[in-house]
């Protein structure tokens, strides 16, 4: 697959729970093309290979250099070099001490393909995983899953506590097509990121901010191009938080209002002054984009399907939450 090399690295499938009806129509309309793509890729011995059986040996995790920086990859075997990803909504499993399900499982979804075996194949292991070059052994771990292979008990590799996956559109070890991709197939919804080996944090690359017209208003938005999508990518409005320094949104809050992340300085797009953009380091070490000193957030119910009239909207403006009030940023 040919990669789009732009200054933007937020790549997503655009959809949210608020637009599930429209989303389902759009996905089902594209289902034949999507299903045939999965079937064709499943037979190729590449990073697209689905999980079909329990592992027979120990998995190795290594690192590689990409446009997003140094990230985790499969370290040995036929899948050596394939990009590895985490999904942010798996944090809910940790925050609820295992009561909440993992976001990516083999359960039903609108696309009709199992998330953790076909779309985002889980990295499985038999025994403790092996730390390759650049990987911190103390951050490697495993967890037991019974929702990956139709009830069979298997061990999935984790890094800094979060499960690791491949992406079925990464046809070769050079590809990172799943980076920064919002996934409506998972439940709860979340964003897929490459993984920084230093702390196990997301490795988002450099984010672009631009002025976009949403629901008749020009607002500051995060540009989210996606070179893999059933539909074209677009932009999502961003929000500031009304509390003293705008940084009160952590843990549960961040699952509903994901921080806008970047690796390095964000890029100013159309209608945005570069000097107004900055970064602040969050408690987990990730770099959050700021505008005029205020940290920026997304809202999980703001997704839309480009080209489908009436689906693009601003749903979080003025939302009063336990952490403060969220507001968009009007631009002229």
Regions found by a protein language model. Give the residues of each.
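Secretory targeting and sorting signals
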Residues: 2-39
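Compact beta-sheet-dominated domain cores in extracellular/mature segments
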Residues: 40-332
């Amino acid at each position: 697959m040919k990669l789009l090399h732009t200054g933007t690295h937020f790549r997503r499938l655009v959809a949210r729970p608020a637009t599930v009806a429209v989303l389902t129509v759009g996905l089902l309309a594209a289902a034949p093309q999507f299903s045939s793509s999965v079937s064709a890729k499943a037979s190729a011995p590449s990073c697209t290979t689905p999980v079909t059986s329990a592992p027979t040996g120990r998995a190795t995790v290594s690192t590689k250099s990409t446009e997003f920086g140094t990230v985790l990859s499969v370290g040995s075997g036929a899948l050596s070099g394939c990009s590895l990803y985490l999904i942010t909504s798996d944090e809910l499993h940790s925050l609820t001490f295992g009561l909440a399900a993992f976001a990516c499982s083999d359960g039903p979804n609108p696309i009709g393909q199992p998330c953790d075996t076909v779309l985002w194949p889980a990295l499985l292991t038999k025994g403790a995983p092996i730390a390759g070059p650049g990987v911190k052994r103390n951050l490697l771990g495993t967890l037991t899953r019974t929702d990956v292979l139709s009830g069979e008990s298997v061990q999935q590799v984790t890094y800094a506590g979060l499960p690791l996956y491949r992406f079925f559109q990464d046809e070769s070890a050079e590809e990172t097509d799943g980076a920064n991709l919002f996934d409506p197939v998972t439940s709860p919804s979340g964003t897929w990121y490459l993984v920084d080996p230093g702390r196990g944090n997301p490795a988002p690359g450099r984010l672009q901010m631009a002025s976009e017209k949403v629901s008749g208003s020009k607002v500051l938005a995060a540009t989210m191009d996606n070179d893999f999508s059933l539909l074209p990518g677009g932009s999502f409005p961003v929000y500031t938080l009304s509390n003293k320094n705008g940084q009160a949104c952590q843990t549960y809050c961040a699952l509903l209002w994901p921080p806008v992340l970047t690796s390095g300085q964000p890029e100013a797009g159309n209608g945005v002054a570069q000097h107004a953009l900055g970064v602040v380091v969050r408690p987990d070490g990730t770099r959050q984009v700021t505008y005029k000193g205020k940290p920026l957030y997304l809202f999980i119910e703001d997704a839309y399907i480009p080209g489908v009239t009436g689906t693009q909207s601003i749903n979080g403006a003025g939302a009063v939450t336990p952490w403060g009030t969220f507001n968009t940023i009007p631009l002229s």
